[in-house]
């Protein structure tokens, strides 16, 4: 990575926090919109794309919806893995305590990877359909979205 690269992480998606404090959805939705907007705008400017504001205006709504839905699906996989390992433990199948620690980053990694993949694939498929961008430009935009807006806060343990 170059010294002057900018990284923006979607640090605003701790799924467990939203269930503890449901009113935070009112903050999370606009905050994710702002982060997605920054990533699309900075990526378009970095690639020197023509009419970055028009690109943002035409693509931000699907990007925002896809990003939030991908985060939820990734968090859902994490929850399924957590409960799945718990069930295996009750059935007598030995699982290291490191994996069963609630909220452990090891269980969250597949959910994080799934969310990043979905952000990339779904944005590539749907978000830039009406743009005049070539495949390489779309690839770079979607890769930036996937890498910079993946829900990295899923790696934070719930307690410990």
Segments predicted by a language model, with ranges:
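Juxtamembrane/disordered regions of integral membrane proteins
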Residues: 1-160
């Amino acid at each position: 990575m170059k010294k002057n690269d900018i990284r923006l992480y979607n640090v605003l998606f701790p799924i467990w926090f939203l269930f503890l404090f449901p009113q935070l959805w009112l903050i999370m939705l606009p905050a994710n919109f702002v982060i997605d907007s920054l990533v699309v705008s900075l990526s378009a400017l970095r690639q020197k794309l023509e009419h970055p504001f028009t690109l943002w205006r035409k693509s931000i709504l699907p990007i925002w919806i896809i990003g939030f839905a991908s985060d939820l699906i990734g968090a859902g996989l994490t929850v399924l893995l957590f409960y799945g390992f718990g069930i295996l433990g009750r059935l007598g199948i030995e699982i290291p305590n490191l994996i069963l620690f609630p909220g452990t980053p090891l269980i969250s990694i597949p959910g994080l990877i799934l969310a990043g993949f979905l952000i990339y694939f779904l944005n590539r498929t749907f978000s830039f359909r009406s743009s005049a961008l070539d495949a390489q430009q779309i690839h770079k935009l979607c890769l930036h979205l996937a890498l910079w807006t993946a829900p990295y806060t899923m790696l934070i343990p719930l307690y410990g």
